[in-house]
Protein backbone atom coordinates (compact mmCIF):
# COMPACT_ATOMS: atom_id res chain seq x y z
CA UNK A 1 0.00 0.00 0.00
CA UNK A 2 1.37 3.41 -0.99
CA UNK A 3 2.06 5.78 1.90
CA UNK A 4 -0.04 8.93 1.76
CA UNK A 5 1.71 12.07 3.01
CA UNK A 6 0.40 15.51 3.87
CA UNK A 7 3.46 16.86 2.12
CA UNK A 8 6.02 15.16 -0.12
CA UNK A 9 9.12 16.41 -1.93
CA UNK A 10 11.52 14.44 -4.14
CA UNK A 11 14.63 16.13 -5.51
CA UNK A 12 17.21 14.48 -7.75
CA UNK A 13 20.52 15.92 -8.96
CA UNK A 14 22.90 14.78 -11.71
CA UNK A 15 26.20 15.95 -13.15
CA UNK A 16 25.96 16.88 -16.81
CA UNK A 17 29.19 17.98 -18.50
CA UNK A 18 30.68 19.17 -15.22
CA UNK A 19 27.57 21.06 -14.12
CA UNK A 20 24.94 19.92 -11.64
CA UNK A 21 21.35 19.94 -12.84
CA UNK A 22 18.09 18.99 -11.17
CA UNK A 23 16.76 15.98 -13.06
CA UNK A 24 13.85 15.46 -10.67
CA UNK A 25 11.70 17.99 -8.83
CA UNK A 26 8.44 16.61 -7.48
CA UNK A 27 6.14 18.16 -4.88
CA UNK A 28 2.69 17.41 -3.54
CA UNK A 29 0.38 18.30 -0.67
CA UNK A 30 1.52 21.07 1.65
CA UNK A 31 5.16 20.81 0.56
CA UNK A 32 6.71 22.97 -2.12
CA UNK A 33 10.17 23.57 -3.55
CA UNK A 34 11.48 26.99 -4.54
CA UNK A 35 12.44 28.00 -8.04
CA UNK A 36 15.94 27.15 -9.21
CA UNK A 37 18.73 29.17 -7.60
CA UNK A 38 22.50 29.01 -7.95
CA UNK A 39 25.19 30.35 -5.64
CA UNK A 40 28.27 32.27 -6.76
CA UNK A 41 29.96 28.98 -7.64
CA UNK A 42 27.10 27.78 -9.83
CA UNK A 43 25.95 25.21 -7.26
CA UNK A 44 22.15 24.78 -7.41
CA UNK A 45 20.24 25.30 -4.19
CA UNK A 46 16.60 24.96 -3.25
CA UNK A 47 14.36 26.03 -0.39
CA UNK A 48 11.89 23.58 1.13
CA UNK A 49 8.60 25.39 1.79
CA UNK A 50 5.57 24.45 3.88
CA UNK A 51 2.45 26.11 2.47
CA UNK A 52 0.57 25.87 5.76
CA UNK A 53 3.22 27.73 7.72
CA UNK A 54 3.81 24.74 10.00
CA UNK A 55 2.99 21.12 10.76
CA UNK A 56 -0.46 20.31 12.15
CA UNK A 57 -1.18 17.52 14.62
CA UNK A 58 -0.96 14.06 13.10
CA UNK A 59 0.46 15.20 9.76
CA UNK A 60 3.19 13.20 8.03
CA UNK A 61 5.82 14.61 5.68
CA UNK A 62 8.48 13.05 3.48
CA UNK A 63 11.58 14.60 1.90
CA UNK A 64 13.64 12.47 -0.51
CA UNK A 65 16.91 13.70 -2.02
CA UNK A 66 19.10 11.78 -4.48
CA UNK A 67 22.49 13.16 -5.51
CA UNK A 68 24.09 11.21 -8.33
CA UNK A 69 27.77 10.68 -9.10
CA UNK A 70 29.89 13.88 -9.11
CA UNK A 71 26.87 16.15 -8.51
CA UNK A 72 26.79 18.93 -5.89
CA UNK A 73 23.64 20.51 -4.48
CA UNK A 74 22.44 22.49 -1.50
CA UNK A 75 19.01 22.13 0.10
CA UNK A 76 17.74 24.29 2.94
CA UNK A 77 14.47 25.25 4.59
CA UNK A 78 12.87 28.63 3.96
CA UNK A 79 12.04 29.10 7.65
CA UNK A 80 12.20 27.12 10.88
CA UNK A 81 9.84 24.16 11.14
CA UNK A 82 6.87 25.13 13.31
CA UNK A 83 5.09 22.19 14.95
CA UNK A 84 1.66 23.16 16.22
CA UNK A 85 0.02 21.85 19.39
CA UNK A 86 -1.30 18.29 19.49
CA UNK A 87 -4.48 18.47 21.56
CA UNK A 88 -5.45 14.85 20.80
CA UNK A 89 -2.01 13.43 21.54
CA UNK A 90 -1.31 12.44 17.93
CA UNK A 91 2.29 12.44 16.75
CA UNK A 92 3.40 14.75 13.93
CA UNK A 93 6.19 13.25 11.81
CA UNK A 94 8.72 14.05 9.13
CA UNK A 95 10.99 11.55 7.38
CA UNK A 96 14.01 12.52 5.32
CA UNK A 97 15.74 10.04 2.99
CA UNK A 98 19.03 11.01 1.33
CA UNK A 99 21.16 9.01 -1.12
CA UNK A 100 24.64 10.16 -2.13
CA UNK A 101 26.49 8.39 -4.93
CA UNK A 102 30.21 8.32 -5.71
CA UNK A 103 32.00 11.65 -5.21
CA UNK A 104 28.72 13.53 -4.76
CA UNK A 105 28.33 16.45 -2.37
CA UNK A 106 25.20 17.54 -0.51
CA UNK A 107 24.80 20.45 1.87
CA UNK A 108 21.53 19.97 3.76
CA UNK A 109 21.11 23.02 5.97
CA UNK A 110 17.79 22.73 7.79
CA UNK A 111 16.69 25.45 10.17
CA UNK A 112 15.67 24.48 13.67
CA UNK A 113 12.35 22.99 14.80
CA UNK A 114 10.17 25.24 16.96
CA UNK A 115 7.70 23.03 18.86
CA UNK A 116 4.55 24.75 20.08
CA UNK A 117 2.75 24.28 23.38
CA UNK A 118 1.58 20.64 23.79
CA UNK A 119 3.13 19.52 20.50
CA UNK A 120 4.43 16.01 19.80
CA UNK A 121 6.96 15.56 17.00
CA UNK A 122 9.22 12.85 15.57
CA UNK A 123 11.81 13.59 12.90
CA UNK A 124 13.76 10.74 11.32
CA UNK A 125 16.56 11.12 8.77
CA UNK A 126 18.41 8.34 6.98
CA UNK A 127 21.42 9.09 4.79
CA UNK A 128 22.91 6.39 2.55
CA UNK A 129 26.21 7.53 1.10
CA UNK A 130 29.18 6.23 -0.83
CA UNK A 131 32.47 6.44 1.07
CA UNK A 132 33.76 8.95 -1.49
CA UNK A 133 30.77 11.28 -1.04
CA UNK A 134 30.73 14.53 0.96
CA UNK A 135 27.96 15.55 3.35
CA UNK A 136 27.10 18.59 5.44
CA UNK A 137 23.93 18.03 7.47
CA UNK A 138 22.49 20.37 10.10
CA UNK A 139 19.33 20.62 12.17
CA UNK A 140 18.23 21.77 15.61
CA UNK A 141 15.47 22.43 18.12
CA UNK A 142 14.53 25.37 20.32
CA UNK A 143 12.88 25.82 23.70
CA UNK A 144 9.64 26.16 21.75
CA UNK A 145 6.80 28.63 21.69
CA UNK A 146 3.84 29.35 23.98
CA UNK A 147 1.51 32.33 24.44
CA UNK A 148 3.13 33.14 27.79
CA UNK A 149 6.61 32.84 26.23
CA UNK A 150 7.45 30.07 28.69
CA UNK A 151 10.15 27.66 27.49
CA UNK A 152 9.75 23.92 26.98
CA UNK A 153 5.97 23.72 26.97
CA UNK A 154 5.87 20.98 24.33
CA UNK A 155 5.15 17.38 25.29
CA UNK A 156 7.48 15.32 23.10
CA UNK A 157 10.33 15.86 20.65
CA UNK A 158 12.42 13.12 19.09
CA UNK A 159 15.05 13.45 16.38
CA UNK A 160 16.85 10.40 14.97
CA UNK A 161 19.62 10.80 12.39
CA UNK A 162 21.42 7.79 10.91
CA UNK A 163 24.18 7.63 8.31
CA UNK A 164 25.06 4.49 6.36
CA UNK A 165 28.13 3.87 4.21
CA UNK A 166 27.93 0.82 1.94
CA UNK A 167 24.87 -0.33 3.92
CA UNK A 168 26.76 -0.21 7.22
CA UNK A 169 25.50 2.04 10.01
CA UNK A 170 28.38 4.41 10.79
CA UNK A 171 26.62 7.21 12.68
CA UNK A 172 23.49 7.31 14.80
CA UNK A 173 22.37 10.27 16.88
CA UNK A 174 19.13 10.61 18.79
CA UNK A 175 17.68 13.53 20.71
CA UNK A 176 14.70 12.76 22.95
CA UNK A 177 13.07 15.59 24.88
CA UNK A 178 10.06 15.19 27.18
CA UNK A 179 9.93 18.42 29.19
CA UNK A 180 7.17 17.12 31.48
CA UNK A 181 9.50 14.33 32.60
CA UNK A 182 12.92 15.98 32.29
CA UNK A 183 14.54 19.10 33.69
CA UNK A 184 15.53 20.90 30.50
CA UNK A 185 17.86 23.28 32.36
CA UNK A 186 20.06 20.63 33.98
CA UNK A 187 23.47 19.41 32.83
CA UNK A 188 23.19 17.26 29.74
CA UNK A 189 20.12 19.08 28.45
CA UNK A 190 19.86 22.78 27.55
CA UNK A 191 21.78 23.98 30.63
CA UNK A 192 20.05 27.38 30.69
CA UNK A 193 20.21 27.97 26.93
CA UNK A 194 17.21 28.07 24.60
CA UNK A 195 18.55 26.77 21.30
CA UNK A 196 20.32 23.55 20.33
CA UNK A 197 21.81 22.78 16.93
CA UNK A 198 24.04 20.09 15.52
CA UNK A 199 26.12 19.81 12.38
CA UNK A 200 27.52 16.60 10.91
CA UNK A 201 30.19 16.66 8.22
CA UNK A 202 31.34 13.47 6.51
CA UNK A 203 34.05 13.50 3.84
CA UNK A 204 37.12 11.44 2.93
CA UNK A 205 39.03 14.74 3.20
CA UNK A 206 38.26 15.23 6.90
CA UNK A 207 41.06 14.04 9.19
CA UNK A 208 42.27 14.93 12.67
CA UNK A 209 44.29 17.86 11.34
CA UNK A 210 41.21 19.33 9.68
CA UNK A 211 39.16 18.96 12.88
CA UNK A 212 41.85 20.75 14.92
CA UNK A 213 42.15 23.51 12.34
CA UNK A 214 38.38 24.02 12.33
CA UNK A 215 38.35 24.16 16.13
CA UNK A 216 41.05 26.84 16.07
CA UNK A 217 39.15 28.75 13.39
CA UNK A 218 35.97 28.84 15.49
CA UNK A 219 37.82 29.80 18.65
CA UNK A 220 39.12 32.84 16.80
CA UNK A 221 35.60 34.15 16.21
CA UNK A 222 33.59 36.29 18.63
CA UNK A 223 30.87 33.74 19.38
CA UNK A 224 27.97 34.00 21.82
CA UNK A 225 27.14 30.27 21.94
CA UNK A 226 28.83 27.28 23.54
CA UNK A 227 30.00 24.56 21.17
CA UNK A 228 32.00 21.34 21.03
CA UNK A 229 33.50 19.41 18.11
CA UNK A 230 34.13 15.66 18.09
CA UNK A 231 35.74 13.45 15.46
CA UNK A 232 33.74 10.48 14.21
CA UNK A 233 35.02 6.92 13.83
CA UNK A 234 34.74 7.50 10.09
CA UNK A 235 36.19 10.48 8.20
CA UNK A 236 33.97 13.16 9.65
CA UNK A 237 32.99 15.26 12.64
CA UNK A 238 29.99 16.37 14.65
CA UNK A 239 29.48 19.86 16.05
CA UNK A 240 27.00 20.52 18.87
CA UNK A 241 25.89 24.02 19.85
CA UNK A 242 23.90 25.58 22.69
CA UNK A 243 23.00 29.25 22.42
CA UNK A 244 20.64 32.07 23.34
CA UNK A 245 19.26 32.53 19.83
CA UNK A 246 18.99 30.49 16.66
CA UNK A 247 20.87 33.27 14.88
CA UNK A 248 23.87 32.87 17.20
CA UNK A 249 23.95 29.13 16.60
CA UNK A 250 23.48 29.47 12.88
CA UNK A 251 26.49 31.75 12.69
CA UNK A 252 28.65 28.88 13.93
CA UNK A 253 27.03 26.38 11.57
CA UNK A 254 27.62 28.55 8.53
CA UNK A 255 31.15 29.36 9.64
CA UNK A 256 31.89 25.62 9.71
CA UNK A 257 30.23 25.01 6.36
CA UNK A 258 32.11 27.93 4.79
CA UNK A 259 35.42 26.68 6.20
CA UNK A 260 34.82 23.23 4.70
CA UNK A 261 33.72 24.70 1.38
CA UNK A 262 36.81 26.87 1.13
CA UNK A 263 39.49 24.54 2.51
CA UNK A 264 38.31 21.31 0.86
CA UNK A 265 36.48 22.42 -2.27
CA UNK A 266 37.79 25.93 -2.96
CA UNK A 267 34.28 27.42 -2.89
CA UNK A 268 33.12 30.85 -1.74
CA UNK A 269 31.01 31.31 1.43
CA UNK A 270 27.30 30.62 1.48
CA UNK A 271 24.84 33.44 0.89
CA UNK A 272 21.34 31.97 0.86
CA UNK A 273 19.47 35.28 0.91
CA UNK A 274 16.82 34.39 3.45
CA UNK A 275 15.60 36.27 6.48
CA UNK A 276 17.02 35.10 9.76
CA UNK A 277 14.37 34.01 12.26
CA UNK A 278 14.97 34.60 15.95
CA UNK A 279 13.26 32.50 18.59
From Swiss-Prot:
Cellular component annotations (GO), alphabetically ordered: cytoplasm
Alphabetized UniProt keyword annotations: Chaperone, Cytoplasm, Nickel insertion
Gene Ontology MF term list: nickel cation binding
InterPro entries noted in UniProt: UreD
Subcellular location field: Cytoplasm
Subunit structure: UreD, UreF and UreG form a complex that acts as a GTP-hydrolysis-dependent molecular chaperone, activating the urease apoprotein by helping to assemble the nickel containing metallocenter of UreC. The UreE protein probably delivers the nickel.
Function field: Required for maturation of urease via the functional incorporation of the urease nickel metallocenter.
Family under the similarity heading: Belongs to the UreD family.
Protein name per the record: Urease accessory protein UreD
Organism, scientific name: Streptococcus thermophilus (strain ATCC BAA-491 / LMD-9)
Amino acid sequence: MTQVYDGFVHLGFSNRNGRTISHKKYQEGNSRVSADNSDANGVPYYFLINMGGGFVEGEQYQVTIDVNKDAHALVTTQTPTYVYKCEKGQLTQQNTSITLEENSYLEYMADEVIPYLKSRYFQKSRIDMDKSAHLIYSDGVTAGWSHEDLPFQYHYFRNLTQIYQDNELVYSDQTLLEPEKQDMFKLGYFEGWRNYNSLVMVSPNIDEAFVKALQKHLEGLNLESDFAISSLDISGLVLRILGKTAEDNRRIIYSCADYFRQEIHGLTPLNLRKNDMRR
